[in-house]
């Protein structure tokens, strides 16, 4: 593929890491942040000390705080803001010429919609979109360590272009047309990572964590199937791959947040210690609302949501799960 200009909207750790990857393989990459001071610091230090310290920017990675200019200058636009800011960004930007891709994992907190539904209401149901997900920590992608991702799209031509844009020796990209499944995996796995962190924070050991991962996978699969997703998606990179990674490795901010809660650190202090958005905290209520609407039982997610809203404490949430009536697996 000829080298392109990419607008990466969102300069957190994940958006920055993917921007570094795209710039390293030759694409001019515009890294947008809403904060002019953050942009000035990145431009001065040629890195992102706030969210991805110690990894220098390639020369063709350019920080910017001009949202409209970034979009209008780019061949391809990728959104990497937290889910609660996604609607605001899509409402502000002009319609991208090629389509719109995003790295964001979550659902819209105001409407409980999938992000693809928000984009369809803004730019039309036939507008090309792509969701990029899978087991991937920012530092490892930025350091060119081997990574495999899933790229789901509603448009095969746009999907092919995005595949060519991302695919490289260190990143293998698998294709999917299951937008619903890939998006749900990305949202639910963060809630389950909080649960696994809490379990480890309470000192419950490997058996409990394995049970949470396995039963959590069953929960997210049930929800996905009720909404038209495909079961194989949940057994792939975006599903079990990302779930296992996020639940077991302390690079996961959702898992670290859960660890703190399991050690009885108050929620505001735990968020402060993490220092970045904890998507699982923001998405728990939304996922439970979607599950309730679709009449799907998600007991692990429900207990985490109750804990986050002060209804139960960590030990009580575990007791509630363990005392549920016996049932077939």
UniProtKB/Swiss-Prot annotation:
Biological or metabolic pathway of the protein: Membrane lipid metabolism; glycerophospholipid metabolism
Entry GO MF terms: glycerol-3-phosphate dehydrogenase [NAD(P)+] activity; NAD binding
Sites where the protein binds sn-glycerol 3-phosphate: 105, 134, 136, 189, 242, 252-254
Keyword NAD set for record: yes
Enzyme class: oxidoreductase
E.C. code: 1.1.1.94
Annotated positions binding NADPH: 13-14, 34, 105, 138, 253, 277, 279
GO CC, any one term: cytosol
PANTHER family listed in its UniProt record: GLYCEROL-3-PHOSPHATE DEHYDROGENASE, GLYCEROL-3-PHOSPHATE DEHYDROGENASE [NAD(+)] 2, CHLOROPLASTIC
Family from the record: Belongs to the NAD-dependent glycerol-3-phosphate dehydrogenase family.
Protein name: Glycerol-3-phosphate dehydrogenase [NAD(P)+]
Organism encoding this protein: Legionella pneumophila (strain Corby)
The organism's taxonomic lineage, starting at the top: Bacteria, Pseudomonadati, Pseudomonadota, Gammaproteobacteria, Legionellales
Gene that this polypeptide is encoded by: gpsA
């Amino acid at each position: 593929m000829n080298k392109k200009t990419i607008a990466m909207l969102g300069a957190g750790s994940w958006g920055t890491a993917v921007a570094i990857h795209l710039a390293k393989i030759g694409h001019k990459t515009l890294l947008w942040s809403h904060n002019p001071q953050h942009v000035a610091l990145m431009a001065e230090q040629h890195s992102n000390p706030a969210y991805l310290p110690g990894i220098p920017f390639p020369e063709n990675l350019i920080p910017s705080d001009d949202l409209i200019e970034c979009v209008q200058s780019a061949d391809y636009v990728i959104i990497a803001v937290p889910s609660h800011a996604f609607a605001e960004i899509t409402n502000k930007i002009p319609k991208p010429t090629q389509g719109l891709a995003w790295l964001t994992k979550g659902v819209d907190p105001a409407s409980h919609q999938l992000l693809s539904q928000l984009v369809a209401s803004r730019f039309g149901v036939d507008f090309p979109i792509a969701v990029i997900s899978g087991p991937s920590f920012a530092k490892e992608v930025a350091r060119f360590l081997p990574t495999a991702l899933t790229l789901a799209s509603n448009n095969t031509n746009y999907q092919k272009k995005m595949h060519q844009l991302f695919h490289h020796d260190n990143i293998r990209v698998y294709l999917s047309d299951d937008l619903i499944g890939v998006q749900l995996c990305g949202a639910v796995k963060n809630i389950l990572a909080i649960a696994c962190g809490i379990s480890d924070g309470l000192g419950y050991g490997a058996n409990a964590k394995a049970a949470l991962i396995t039963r959590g996978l069953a929960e997210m699969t049930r929800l996905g199937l009720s909404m038209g997703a495909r079961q194989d998606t949940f057994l792939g990179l975006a599903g079990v791959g990302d779930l296992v990674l996020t639940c077991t490795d302390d690079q996961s901010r959702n898992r670290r947040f859960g660890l703190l809660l399991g050690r009885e650190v108050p929620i505001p202090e735990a968020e402060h210690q993490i220092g970045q958005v904890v998507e699982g905290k923001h998405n728990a209520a939304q996922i439970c609302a979607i599950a309730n609407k679709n009449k799907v039982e998600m007991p692990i997610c429900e207990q985490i949501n109750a804990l986050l809203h002060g209804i139960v404490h960590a030990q009580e949430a575990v007791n509630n799960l363990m005392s549920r009536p016996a049932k077939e697996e």
